[in-house]
């Protein structure tokens, strides 16, 4: 099974946060916007409420967030998702929620977009030692789980990405980088944590295809590969579910995947990271990586007594 080896990252200049805030106000006043460009034809403004969940850091430029992605269903290169996702159809969409629940059901995208949406400005740390600061739009995963009434025997939550090789060229062909569907999982207490959200947008608009439209998981204290995209199924289970990268290379990608600068990837250090969009054209901006990506005060208690070098 091939394992991805990241290239050296080239960064660009900073976009001040005020530019995003001014742009968001314009979008709200306009009531919606359809963007030109590959993979973004479905973008529309979203109504959000204020949220206390934010970081006092410069936002990563939107052009970087939407053009520098890992989404192997559209290809293994960073530009492939934006280039190859124009034909993907994120609507109509349904998400099946089943397993160890009292009220299994399917949710339509319109139902999910009608939930109270918040903007959450989170750090995002990739296992490849680069990071971004992204203004997500979404709702707590716990609020969706409450609607299906998890049983007492439920201990984990499993997620699956859609399989559409006719629209996702990375899923087509004989040689595949990963087995499909892409799968991920969390412990139930992780899934119900207030920081864990299902995102339906970023930068005040619906998600572009290359960023996981129409629905993706965001768990800000974990490495980015846990943020499964284009979700079509959520199942509650009694045992830990299979996770794609953990199955592909268990010595490199753990089930928990908590950001931990003290536990290196076998092929590179996790002590520092390169913040995308900063550092100028020729250089990189290395900074220290924070335990749990800076969210230790909120989530470290979930792992009390665990050896995080073993449970990585």
Curated annotation (Swiss-Prot):
Primary site of residence: periplasm
Reaction equations catalysed: L-methionyl-[protein] + a quinone + H2O = L-methionyl-(S)-S-oxide-[protein] + a quinol; L-methionyl-[protein] + a quinone + H2O = L-methionyl-(R)-S-oxide-[protein] + a quinol
Species whose genome carries this gene: Sinorhizobium fredii (strain NBRC 101917 / NGR234)
GO cellular component labels: periplasmic space
Cross-referenced Pfam families: Oxidored_molyb
Gene3D superfamilies per record: Oxidoreductase, molybdopterin-binding domain (3.90.420.10)
One of the GO biological process terms: protein repair
Localization per Swiss-Prot or TrEMBL: Periplasm
Assembly behavior: Heterodimer of a catalytic subunit (MsrP) and a heme-binding subunit (MsrQ).
Name of the protein in question: Protein-methionine-sulfoxide reductase catalytic subunit MsrP
Sequence positions that bind Mo-molybdopterin: 69, 72-73, 126, 161, 211, 216, 227-229
Key word Membrane present: no
């Amino acid at each position: 099974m091939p394992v991805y080896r990241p290239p050296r990252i080239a960064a660009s200049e900073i976009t001040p946060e005020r530019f995003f805030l001014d742009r968001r106000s314009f979008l709200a006043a306009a009531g919606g916007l359809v963007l030109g460009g590959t993979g973004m034809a479905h973008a529309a403004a979203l109504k959000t409420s204020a949220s206390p969940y934010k970081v006092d850091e410069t936002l990563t430029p939107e052009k970087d967030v939407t053009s520098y992605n890992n989404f192997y269903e559209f290809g293994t290169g960073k530009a492939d998702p934006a280039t190859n996702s124009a034909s993907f159809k994120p609507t109509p969409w349904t998400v099946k929620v089943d397993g160890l629940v009292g009220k299994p059901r399917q949710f339509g995208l319109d139902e999910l977009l009608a939930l109270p949406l918040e903007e959450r400005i989170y750090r995002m740390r990739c296992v490849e030692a680069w990071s971004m600061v992204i203004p997500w739009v979404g709702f707590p995963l716990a609020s969706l789980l409450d609607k299906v009434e998890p049983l007492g025997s439920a201990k984990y939550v499993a997620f699956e990405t859609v399989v559409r090789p006719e629209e996702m060229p990375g899923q087509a062909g004989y040689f595949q980088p990963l087995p499909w569907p892409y799968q991920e999982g969390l412990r139930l207490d992780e899934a119900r944590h207030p920081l864990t959200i299902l995102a339906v947008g970023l930068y005040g608009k619906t998600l572009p295809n290359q960023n996981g439209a129409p629905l993706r998981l965001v768990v800000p204290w974990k490495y980015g590969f846990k943020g499964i995209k284009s979700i079509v199924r959520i199942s509650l289970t009694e045992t830990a579910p299979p996770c794609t990268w953990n199955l592909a290379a268990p010595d490199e990608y753990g089930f928990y995947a908590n950001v931990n600068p003290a536990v290196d990837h076998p092929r590179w250090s996790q002590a520092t990271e390169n913040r995308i969009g900063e550092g100028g054209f020729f250089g990189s901006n290395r900074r220290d990586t924070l335990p749990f990506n800076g969210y230790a005060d909120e989530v470290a208690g979930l792992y009390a007594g665990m050896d995080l070098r073993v449970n990585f």
